[in-house]
Amino acid sequence: MSERNYDFRQRHWEYHKPDRRNPERTASAGEIMLTDEWKIGYAPGNPITAIAANDFQEYLEKSMNLSLPITRQDGEKTLWLEVSDSVAEGFILDVKENHINITAAEDKMSFRATIHVEDLMNLEEAPVLALGRFERRPMYTTRTVHSGTGLDAYPEQELLALLHAGYDTIDLFLVGIDRNRLGYCDFNDVIERAAKYGINTIFHNYIQTYIHPDEEGAQEKFDAVYGDLIRRYPKISAIGLCGEALEFPSRDKATTGKPHTQSVIDGIPDTRPSPGWYPCEDYPAYIQCIERAVHKFNPQTSVSYSTYNWGYCPLELRKKFLDNYPKNVTLSICFEIFSKRTLEGLHTPVMDYTMSADEPGYYFQSECEEAHKRGITVTGNVNTAGIAWDFGCIPLVPAPAKILKRDLHLREARKKWNLRDHYCTHHYGWWNSVAADLGKWTGWEDFEPDYDELLTKIAIRDYGKEAAPHVRKAWDYWSEGMNHYIASNEDQYGPWRVGPAYPFIFQPSISRTMADKEIKFPTAPHAHFGHCIIKTFYRPYENSEQTPGFLRYPVEIRSLQKMLDLWNKGLAEAVLAVEKAEPKKKDEAKRLEALGHFIRNAVITTIHIKEWWRANIAMQASSTAEEAEKYLDEIEKIAAEEVENVKDTIPVVEFDSRLGWEPSMEYVCDKWHLEWKLRQIESALRETTAYRRMLNLHKQ
């Protein structure tokens, strides 16, 4: 059955899935099972604990077909919730034959505890708990996400869904007072409603303060901007700063001292980096001015700064920046960006967010180590929600082995550098998936499950016992396939970002108006970024640390062919999982197959566009018309194959409306965009016909 655009939201918000219970699962030795003789109880005075009790009651009713009353009095056969100073951190789950006690260190931790109990029962597919006393302390202070259903969209269902998925902090894009990139947004309403569930809120800052810290009256100017902000939003937990969104008139001679859009001299590009993309010698003072302004009006609001934009810089330069960095500003560091990679001896570094990198990059490790030495608190930009720019409009990269390895490296980072805060996803949002499960289960202090057993239980829970082995094999093939992924700028801002809807532009310019060949990709007019982060005229975006594209592409195509082979093997297992899935879990198995199918077709598109570019360039460099026609034949053959790939994608996006959508771009690969792509290729083929005629004009 087809979905309409945005129908996925209803599934996303279904944090208590109905009818999870397996009637054959009973309590074994060392376990208890809740029955209708039990009650759920809590003492008055803790509002989030009360919400947790009622939420757990709803869970049992909806997911376990068990209806239990709420009581205010503790007693036998009662699951009792309480908050006590006797617990320093987290909560204690004490399970006895006739009583369950949950003692939380603070009110909001009661909700975390009942969600953990739900997780345990979901894995068993029954209201069963092991007997014993279990202490659970969160390893991380915050796990932040953006909304999974729309930019800065946080209805009650979204807040509850993200909390059940293991996240506890939300991010809002701040352009001005009650303004984000979409227009008006009542920030205080979001902050207050989130706080009701114990969820913190932070601002992702886009407010411009084009002020040099040494200019006259600088601090007063910062105070005016950020003071007004903090007065209006006294309950905001933190403000996150980032270089590319916070350029300033640096006086560092190594930079242009201007915004990147103005870095020209008499029309000649100034090739020095712009402030915001370079650790300017005066940047620490600039950050300090913002910190002073924020803390003058609210010392409890945290300030963080991301060095995302200059992780490419040499360590000595970054160390100099850290030497002067304000100690009371948190430093945010990206896990994988700028990771060094070689492919058949060529340099192919990671250029942007990707799940293909499960090892921390040199920038991440060196920045964490040097900051920790200097007493600077570090936070990680980590993408543990399982989405990145790998395939820009999907809910999850279904590669649990890669995600788990990343999670385990972050446990080590917590121990080495006290990295206690995670920015789990950028504006591409999150999905309640195996990635969310792994994030929760790897996030406990001094406790880890058997991860292989956990993944099998997750597969059984979501797809059924007979389907689970095939799901595990699909996950393994796809995890291995991600080892052959290409994380270049032209791919992640091109075919990876919008999938098979990516246009194939014939590169010769046949025009009487000398028009640019770049196409403005069609996106919703209200989209946060929309077409601005989609580059449609495919060509290499070169980098000083990267082998040039004409050398890379043959090697990258070979790598992607390996990825395609592994992805098809995983897809075959996903098809078998659909056949074997339990009836009530079959739709979930179909969605896994659809996700794998969409990604497979995105890989094909990326291979095709690299072949397309090479053929276009070779055609234009030909020395004879006959040679050029051979490449033109190849171009038309690639176009025909891509048309079939696009047509094959349409049923997939019709089945799952989350495929082809991303919060900051809105829909970019739904049925409409895929049919647009078919029209665009028709247009390109009219150009190839014209060019073929032009090649033979001299023969007439």
Residue locations for each model-derived region?
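Substrate-binding cleft of carbohydrate-active enzyme catalytic domains
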Residues: 144-305, 316-323, 330-332, 338, ...
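Extracellular/periplasmic catalytic domains that process cell-envelope and extracellular macromolecules
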Residues: 33, 94, 138-139, 232-233, ...
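Acidic, contiguous N-terminal accessory segments
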Residues: 1-108, 123-133
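Structural motif
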Residues: 41-46, 81-85, 103-105, 147-151, ...
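Substrate-binding groove of N-acetylhexosamine-processing glycoside hydrolases
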Residues: 2-22, 26-28, 50, 73, ...
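Solvent-exposed, polar/charged alpha-helical surfaces in well-ordered, non-transmembrane soluble domains
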Residues: 54, 58, 62, 115, ...
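Short active-site loop/helix that positions an aromatic residue
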Residues: 108-121
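Glycine-rich, aromatic-flanked loop segments that form ligand/cofactor-binding clefts
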Residues: 128, 135-147, 152-177, 182, ...
